[in-house]
Regions:
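PP2C/PPM-type serine/threonine phosphatase catalytic domain
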Residues: 1-229
Length: 229
């Protein structure tokens, strides 16, 4: 397994993304990016709290599956609710993660952190972000995404203390040993297409080149995890 990670501040005053890479007691590999929500307070703390609570819960379950991942996110959601009440604030995070055990992957997300599964530069699967624009497209309320460009950052699900908004998206697959998983915050996928991303990854020092040419001057924080086999 080959792992790369990258995070940066962009043009923001602080980095409110949090990367968690660790191993569960079961032997599964755990990868997560939590993105503190813009417009809320203490996003860096929220991202850390969410990540730590999800990992801690899953570290002690007998098996990793959709139900237990949802329970882990609910635990994190409760922790954020308590944090918000204690500090009299609104805070929260969006998440995207991959848990790998043997040749099975569990992909999960809440909000607009995206996860891709790649095979030989072909996208086998990509998450569909929980955003207002996607909800309107699915309901046929709008025909073209560009008509709601200014609303693309509004998420419909998050880990922010509201149980009704923290339902995960989930995808599980048995993968081959030449697969690649990519997790990235919206500061990345709103800046560069997956096709451009893959072109850079195929080059020497690709992820660093990607940062220097595209990401350092973005308006948002940016975070990436790549997991290759």
């Amino acid at each position: 397994m080959q792992i790369q990670q990258l995070t940066g501040i962009g043009k923001r005053e602080s980095n409110q993304d949090f990367i968690c890479i660790d191993r569960l007691e079961s032997g599964a590999s755990f990868f997560l990016i939590a993105d503190g929500m813009g417009g809320y307070e203490k996003g860096d703390d929220a991202a850390r709290i969410v990540s730590e609570n999800i990992f801690t819960f899953l570290n002690y379950v007998e098996s990793v599956n959709e139900q237990n991942i949802q329970k882990a996110v609910q635990k994190a959601n409760l922790a954020i609710k308590q944090f918000n009440i204690k500090n009299d604030i609104k805070s929260g995070a969006t998440i995207g993660g991959v848990i790998v055990y043997k040749n099975t992957s569990h992909i999960f997300w809440v909000g607009d952190v995206m996860v891709y599964q790649i095979n030989k530069d072909k996208v086998l699967f990509q998450t569909k972000s929980h955003t207002l624009v996607n909800s309107l497209l699915e309901s046929n309320s709008i025909k073209e995404e560009k008509t709601l460009e200014k609303y693309k950052h509004i998420v419909t699900r998050s880990v922010s203390g509201k149980p009704c908004e923290s339902n995960i998206g989930y995808h599980s697959t048995v993968f081959s040993q030449d697969n690649l998983f990519i997790i990235c915050s919206d500061g990345v996928h709103n800046t560069i297409s997956i096709e451009q991303f893959l072109l850079f990854l195929n080059q020497k020092n690709g992820i660093q080149e990607l940062e220097s040419k595209f990401l350092k001057n973005t308006q948002d924080n940016y975070s990436i995890i790549t997991i290759g086999f």
